[in-house]
Amino acid sequence: MQVSVETTQGLERRLTISVPAEQIENTVKEALKSEAKRARIPGFRPGKVPVSVINKRYGNAIRQDITGEVMQRNFIEAIIAEKLNPAGAPTFTPGSTEGENFEFVATFEIYPEVELKGLESITVEQPTAEVTEADVDSMIETLRNQHATFEVAERAAAEGDKAKINFVGSIDGEEFEGGKADDFELQLGSGRMIPGFESGVEGHKAGEEFNIEVTFPEDYHAENLKGKVATFAITLNEVQAANLPEVNDEFATLFGITEGGIDALRGEISKNMSRELEQALKANVKEQVLNGLVEQNDIELPAALIDGEVEVLRKQAMQRFGDQAANMPELPADLFTEQAARRVKVGLLLGEVIKANELKAEDERVQALIASMASAYEDPSEVVAYYNGNEELMQNMRNVALEEQAVEALLKTATLTEKAVNFEEFMNKATGRA
């Protein structure tokens, strides 16, 4: 086998590989003989079909298959010999199989050589927070609102009420698509509508007709409405006031608390909030570390890896549409290219951090991650056992553990400053509610 390597552009490489043509010819002959013994063709006894007949019928297909196998096998031998690390599958261009040698070209990308830089320049503002009794009180109020019952109220609508309304929206006197509804149920203060809409309904009574003027946000999803001032003609059909459950032992049973009453419920809420806070704090620090790592290291990315990641993201996006996805056109790749490129870059850089620090997933950390995740379920031990019995899930958790260890390794050389933050404000921002 003769091999020549050519750098075409960036990470792309072109291998020209030449092998004796007899590699193909001898294998083709053996395959034709084997097929002749198995073939069932009218006019010939089983096992007695002439090779020439098989060649005429199946020769091209057999030759193509064997040529592909020869190219794949010799390509693997060539990249091992040349110490090349392909990123993605190669494209093969076969030459003629006539003559003494068979020559083909394999075009592919390689992984970039990553040399980590600027790790000491990564800066992290490490947030610190704790769950207070006031935070638990706030969560209990949220739970009360979630379990509220509603009844018709003969008074002006107020925050927390449900309002049934008809509305028609217009811009410069012209109605716009999606701006009209009848008997629309809206909980005032929920933030479901654009700013100013819900507060504009407050203070009015059932039977009243009125107009409110609001401005669509600049980042509104509908391009034709961004930043536009709209007038909504509203008819308030009904006001329903919320009846909140009392905070007592009976209330605690709604959440599976059978012993200990409200004190036990508060303890469970505090524990859950503390777990969520710890996860959010770690995620915040991790994001800062990865942002710093990406900013400090500019590396060339294989297009094949980006394309592969685009397909993963596109598939995940389509799955979120559920049954509707079958009737939707394929989402364009450019929607995901930027995110895919970042994920590829982060993966390559973290891979080098793991390699440089000779990191291996720690068993104790893996089990701690599984236990933490399982604690949110009714029967944690069942979830832990399920994970430990599933190698694919275990490998996923090992990858998570390795990523954590890599982030911790980067934190050792980063510049850290602590900043105390408010629990509610921090969690709202972390969950996108701010």
UniProtKB/Swiss-Prot annotation:
EC number: 5.2.1.8
Pfam family, one: Trigger_C
Keywords: Cell cycle, Cell division, Chaperone, Cytoplasm, Isomerase, Rotamase
Catalytic activity: [protein]-peptidylproline (omega=180) = [protein]-peptidylproline (omega=0)
Compartments in which it is found: Cytoplasm
The protein's enzyme class: isomerase
GO biological process terms held by the UniProt record: 'de novo' cotranslational protein folding; cell division; chaperone-mediated protein folding; protein transport; protein unfolding
GO CC terms: cytoplasm
Highest taxon, organism lineage: Bacteria
Job of this protein: Involved in protein export. Acts as a chaperone by maintaining the newly synthesized protein in an open conformation. Functions as a peptidyl-prolyl cis-trans isomerase.
Free-text domain note: Consists of 3 domains; the N-terminus binds the ribosome, the middle domain has PPIase activity, while the C-terminus has intrinsic chaperone activity on its own.
Name of the featured protein: Trigger factor
